[in-house]
């Protein structure tokens, strides 16, 4: 086989951080001059997360080729240089759809279609297709869910078969949780033992056990896990809870020397690992002595910490080159004291979303920021809120609205894109990377320092082309358009400290090592506003 595979499973509890672990391993392996590809196998029966409630699943991360994916792919992107595509994710829904389509087309020649071999063979095809497309040295495969879940069984069986076919080219990492009982002052290994027993009963013996824990594991505890789980003691690694930032994870794993173990096991020769640049970025990110800047997030799904995961991370990325310490203030658009909360912030970000709830609150936030000269950044639906607010209060069209919120509005300044009125919702939006031509002399141009960029999209509605001329006549600047049809991509509010809206999702391209330029300029504007307020108060 031309590539090696690392399979990552999780046990004991969910939310162990397998996605962060996989992303961190990718970074460490790339620092060994190896090409890495990544694949997430998700057991849920949805075809993709595109129609799932953000309160249940968190954000939907979009790839360049327009695939709606799990938020873990966002972690893969932010930590490493892996190329992500439709080959980087597969769900049970996709697998079963493919199998049933083949059955309807007669490809199984009348055989009784079963989980084994038909479903498991399709999963193996997915693994092979990812490797064939990305051509990596090492493929990291994260299996979603927890050992013991019935939904995961076909994926684990496929992994077992794949390992049997390629025993020298595969390695299994099992991630578990090792609880600490404060009352007894003891670390308990029994849950890990049972989880490994479950995995071995399926036919997969882990090569590595990675233990999440609140407290460091002693040599004695590692020896006990080694004995009862049938792995060498030096193959038991510890990932203690991170206190400052998720970006410490690669440093923690490097300290455990896990990448050297993996490389030796897979037949590679480890090289000295230099993470000094990453260490510097983490230290800068966690430096609380820098100037404090408060950013208000006026969003619909703030109760779920992962609903705007990429937005949160992009803001923190930008705080490093902006040299400030960021405080993110969640503000519910329905709050009675919305404007009071905004008045205490140095900047406002209005992220994307769908549906009528919270819409008017976002428009109120946009108006307040425009009139009070507070830096404001609108993304996707947030940009549409900026445009509708401008039409209502500057163009004097009080009934202006988006057709998503009111299909009968007399002034539909935001309308549905042509061909988007499909009854089928899954995967039918304008998705993926599209070009955007930047207007010279604009805030966007100052940020990007180029006249053509590629950004990722996920939307059905656009600024109504028939209103653009009137909006521009009243001062709104169209700072970016898609050359493929002249769709409005970026708007800016003139004579303002910094107010900009984008139809795309710049957060999907941001990394700690390469923050997105629009986020950097937004945070710099908020920092300047914070300094201005502080100087005014000291007079």
From Swiss-Prot:
GO CC list: cytosol
Keyword DNA-binding: no
Pathway: Pyrimidine metabolism; CTP biosynthesis via de novo pathway; CTP from UDP: step 2/2
Active site location: 380, 505, 507
Ranges where the record places region Amidoligase domain: 1-268
Catalytic reaction(s) noted: UTP + L-glutamine + ATP + H2O = CTP + L-glutamate + ADP + phosphate + 2 H(+); L-glutamine + H2O = L-glutamate + NH4(+); UTP + NH4(+) + ATP = CTP + ADP + phosphate + 2 H(+)
Residues annotated as binding UTP: 14, 188-193, 224
EC number(s) from the headed UniProt entry: 6.3.4.2
All copies of domain Glutamine amidotransferase type-1, residue ranges: 294-532
InterPro entries (alphabetical): Class_I_gatase-like, CTP_synthase, CTP_synthase_N, GATASE, GATase1_CTP_Synthase, P-loop_NTPase
Residues noted as binding ATP in the record, renumbered to the chain: 15-20, 72
Residue sites binding L-glutamine per the record: 55, 353, 381-384, 404, 460
Listed GO biological process terms: 'de novo' CTP biosynthetic process; pyrimidine nucleobase biosynthetic process
Regulation: Allosterically activated by GTP, when glutamine is the substrate; GTP has no effect on the reaction when ammonia is the substrate. The allosteric effector GTP functions by stabilizing the protein conformation that binds the tetrahedral intermediate(s) formed during glutamine hydrolysis. Inhibited by the product CTP, via allosteric rather than competitive inhibition.
UniProt cross-references to Gene3D superfamilies, sorted A to Z: 3.40.50.880, P-loop containing nucleotide triphosphate hydrolases
Keywords for this protein: ATP-binding, Glutamine amidotransferase, Ligase, Magnesium, Metal-binding, Nucleotide-binding, Pyrimidine biosynthesis
GO molecular function: ATP binding; CTP synthase activity; glutaminase activity; identical protein binding; metal ion binding
Further information: CTPSs have evolved a hybrid strategy for distinguishing between UTP and CTP. The overlapping regions of the product feedback inhibitory and substrate sites recognize a common feature in both compounds, the triphosphate moiety. To differentiate isosteric substrate and product pyrimidine rings, an additional pocket far from the expected kinase/ligase catalytic site, specifically recognizes the cytosine and ribose portions of the product inhibitor.
Family per similarity comment: Belongs to the CTP synthase family.
Protein task: Catalyzes the ATP-dependent amination of UTP to CTP with either L-glutamine or ammonia as the source of nitrogen. Regulates intracellular CTP levels through interactions with the four ribonucleotide triphosphates.
Name of the featured protein: CTP synthase
Taxonomic classification: Bacteria, Pseudomonadati, Chlamydiota, Chlamydiia, Chlamydiales
